[in-house]
């Protein structure tokens, strides 16, 4: 049985993304918004899916998400709860009694998280008690506001400290260039340090790419973050497709991310998705019928990325793709050599291209014959991700070297003795970008491989004596 995954939604962005994620999972598992299955889940109806990773089954027909909602003000959590009919466990919600929010300050969010850590961890411990084969957490949050970044950072540290053997994945939303949060660059760099040090895998989204994709994807010209959240939820549901519609491969978080993360430092991943069909979004464009061959090659197009990528030559270290729908394996075999030709990969990267054949949910409405039959998601570990970090670091430097807005952090517990937290966080980002730059070289793993050769040689010598 696939292990259970607990989803933790932090802050306004995290909870709004979670709203669309759970709505998508309900559709794909044939569950109504009140948590009751649309089908009689008894011996006469054998499910083709596995609800256990993300839902607790309370009765034969009643399901509750393995979700925890956290915020410093009630609006976003209330919106999520009111969008469903008693779907979520009300005990799995923590909202600050003050209800004032973090005021877009990482420092305020972080300190509130530390102050209320025992209460929040009690909720998580209780949810863990309902699991039999717990695998890990997934954290939904933004990095530029106050709660998702600050409280999210303190929570990441606490999760790593208490559950060090559990896999922690973050789905982290980065701001657009036109962000209205003036201290956003500070918040982002402080959060990035925690993503570097405390997450096992971080899937990155940025609002620049999301807004551009939204304009091309939806027929409605008046798009908003409600539309971008649908794009994010499409990626989330597709990443977890092989866990919820399992086959003999890629049926755990570890089996997916082990194909993508060659070293612990290189754990930032870029999602691409195409096409956004009515299976995933409301009000999208219509697409012609396609094949897995078409989708796999289209996934390489930067225009289908949910992260703004630099246009110059980039290096891909590892790639994992899921194609969902009516898939002919011959189409995949045709596409793989062309993908290999188009991707610049270092010689040290072995088994760099991995493709999973996902299953379209049997609970979704049947497609018309003229509609496309395949959608695809690609997660890539690529040097292109550093462009997001370079933008964040550059914006941080412009503020920090002028001493702008630092007074908003002076009362924070981590800043009582000066600005070391800023300096150290910025240094962590520099080292991480250098690691990605080093990984572009064919010699990146030579030291490790040479050590392995020496060890093997040593064992051989012992055997000869």
Curated annotation (Swiss-Prot):
Entry's localization field: Cytoplasm, Cytoskeleton, Microtubule organizing center, Spindle pole body
Superkingdom of origin: Eukaryota
GO BP field: cytoplasmic microtubule organization; microtubule nucleation by spindle pole body; mitotic spindle organization; positive regulation of cytoplasmic translation
InterPro entries linked to this entry: Gamma_tubulin (IPR002454), Tub_FtsZ_C (IPR008280), Tubulin (IPR000217), Tubulin/FtsZ-like_C (IPR037103), Tubulin/FtsZ_2-layer-sand-dom (IPR018316), Tubulin/FtsZ_GTPase_sf (IPR036525), Tubulin_C (IPR023123), Tubulin_CS (IPR017975)
Annotated binding of GTP, by residue: 144-150
Pfam families: Tubulin, Tubulin_C
Keyword set includes Phosphoprotein: no
Main location class: cytoplasm
Keywords: Cytoplasm, Cytoskeleton, GTP-binding, Microtubule, Nucleotide-binding
Gene Ontology molecular function: any one: structural constituent of cytoskeleton
GO cellular component: cytoplasm; gamma-tubulin small complex; inner plaque of spindle pole body; microtubule; outer plaque of spindle pole body
Family assignment from sequence similarity: Belongs to the tubulin family.
Function description: Tubulin is the major constituent of microtubules. The gamma chain is found at microtubule organizing centers (MTOC) such as the spindle poles or the centrosome, suggesting that it is involved in the minus-end nucleation of microtubule assembly.
Stated name of the protein: Tubulin gamma chain
